[in-house]
From Swiss-Prot:
Pfam families on file: GIY-YIG, SLX1_C
Gene Ontology molecular-function annotations: 5'-flap endonuclease activity; crossover junction DNA endonuclease activity; zinc ion binding
Superkingdom per UniProt: Eukaryota
Classification via InterPro entries: GIY-YIG_endonuc (IPR000305), GIY-YIG_endonuc_sf (IPR035901), Slx1 (IPR027520), SLX1_C (IPR048749), SLX1_endonuclease (IPR050381), Znf_RING/FYVE/PHD (IPR013083)
Cofactors named for this entry: a divalent metal cation
Alphabetical GO biological process terms: double-strand break repair via homologous recombination
Summary of the function given for this chain in its UniProt record: Catalytic subunit of the slx1-slx4 structure-specific endonuclease that resolves DNA secondary structures generated during DNA repair and recombination. Has endonuclease activity towards branched DNA substrates, introducing single-strand cuts in duplex DNA close to junctions with ss-DNA.
Keyword DNA damage: yes
Annotated spans, Disordered: 88-136
Binding partners and assembly: Forms a heterodimer with slx4.
Principal subcellular localisation of the protein: nucleus
Protein name: Structure-specific endonuclease subunit slx1
Taxonomic source organism: Neosartorya fischeri (strain ATCC 1020 / DSM 3700 / CBS 544.65 / FGSC A1164 / JCM 1740 / NRRL 181 / WB 181)
Length: 406
């Protein structure tokens, strides 16, 4: 019997998204997938490097362009569920029609005519009708309104100006509005000023500049480590109780000048109570009890997950800090900021911008995560609980087996 490998928990990914591709040769050809690295995934789909999908491999359709991404997923599983949801709905409808609908059974019997010697005639399989851009907009709209995804801090980032205008025109015709305001970011070729262009301060400038590494919150992680390294007087700003960082999950305010620390449960309860949403289980944002700034809950959880799960990297950072502290104790005239700068220089080596090392974790985990981002809908969820050995990268399609490229 093979040994069962147990995968240790990893930090929450800084960036994970579902994306929509369009062929620049034939605009009716669209493709959906999910990835933690959109720039690398686009290069794979265009055949520059290995690892593309079968349905984007046709040279007559290349190159592909990335039209939009839905970002803000806190796990690979959540992104895959969002990616595969439309295909799963179609599968359930087909199974229901085959098993429980008498009319469908009668129609099947009528269509099965007999030939000579009573041999039944095989019915030809109808090709799936092309899924238009409006159909993808409808799927996106339905998923964002669903109970499961409407409470997540998801954002829509448009890289194509004409696609944003198409979405805007389509959404204006829809009677049902989204349950909560979804942040829309205009990026790439989209204009920077628009009626719904909220969050343009977070523009990447293009898919190739997507911020997908923990280097984006380096200062935040460093500040939290400094605050909690000497927990003699670390208290919760909600319950005023003593905090033991090594034994309790502790949140730190992401504001640079704020030193607020709280118990995880205390702060989450405070945020949920302030939101006054009866069905909310996980907060989206809240007001810091110390500096009173609005802070994003997912950002705080990413920092906390790194601090509590990336043990090896955390120990290396602390060792550097303590070496600097020892040197500082024998050198006079040094200010605290110089110590912070010295540690920052060392941290830059650990927070490199290389996409292969963006999580500061082992390479096998990151490569496996990226290579499995476009697996088939019927197989993807079954393989999540199994630890796969390192094999040659094989990328399959993001949609179901009977789907066809448009």
């Amino acid at each position: 019997m093979e040994d069962i490998q147990i995968e240790h928990p990893r930090p929450i990914p800084i960036f994970y998204c579902c994306y929509l591709l369009r062929s620049t040769v034939r605009h009716a050809s669209l493709y959906i997938g999910s990835t933690p690295n959109p720039a690398r995934r686009l290069v794979q789909h265009n055949g520059v490097v290995k690892g593309g999908a079968r349905r984007t491999a046709a040279e007559k359709l290349r190159p592909w362009e990335m039209l939009l991404v839905v970002e803000g997923f806190t796990s690979r599983l959540a992104a895959l569920q969002f990616d595969s949801a439309p295909a799963e709905v179609k599968h359930r409808r087909k199974r229901k029609a085959k098993s429980g609908d008498p009319e469908s059974l009668d129609s099947n019997c009528d269509s099965a005519k007999t030939k000579d010697k009573g041999t039944p005639k095989k019915s030809k399989r109808r090709p799936r009708p092309p899924r238009s851009l409006d159909t993808h907009f409808s799927d996106l709209h339905r998923l964002l309104r669903s109970t499961y995804f409407s409470h997540r801090p998801l954002k829509i980032r448009f890289f194509s100006g004409d696609i944003y205008q198409s979405w805007k025109a389509w959404y204006d015709r829809v009677d049902v509005r989204l349950r909560s305001p979804v942040k829309v970011i205009l990026d790439g070729s989209c204009p920077e000023i628009g009626a719904h262009a909220s969050g343009n301060d977070t523009r990447f400038g293009g898919v190739e500049n997507a911020k997908i590494t923990y280097a984006t919150i380096q200062d935040y992680i460093e500040k939290a480590i400094f605050l909690l390294d000497d927990p003699k007087d670390v208290r919760c700003h909600v319950c005023q109780g003593q905090i033991v960082p090594k034994e309790e999950l502790t949140t730190v305010c992401p504001q640079a000048e704020c030193h607020c620390t709280c118990h995880l449960l205390c702060l989450s309860r405070k945020f949920i109570d302030a939101a006054e949403e009866p069905n909310q289980i996980v907060p989206r944002h809240g007001i810091c009890p110390a500096c009173e700034a609005t802070v994003e809950w997912p950002l705080m959880m990413k920092e906390l997950s790194f601090r509590s799960r990336a043990k090896q990297e955390l120990l290396e950072i602390l060792k550097r800090k303590r070496r600097v502290d020892r040197k500082q104790s024998v050198v006079t005239g040094k200010v605290e900021s110089s110590s912070r700068r010295s540690v920052s220089v060392d941290l830059d080596d650990r927070f490199g911008q290389d996409a292969e090392d963006e999580f500061l974790l082992d390479e096998d985990w990151w490569d496996g995560l990226a290579s499995e981002s476009d697996s088939d809908a019927d197989r993807r969820l079954k393989t999540l609980s199994k630890a796969a050995p390192k094999l040659e990268t094989v990328i399959e399609d993001s949609e179901c087996d009977d789907a066809e490229i448009l």
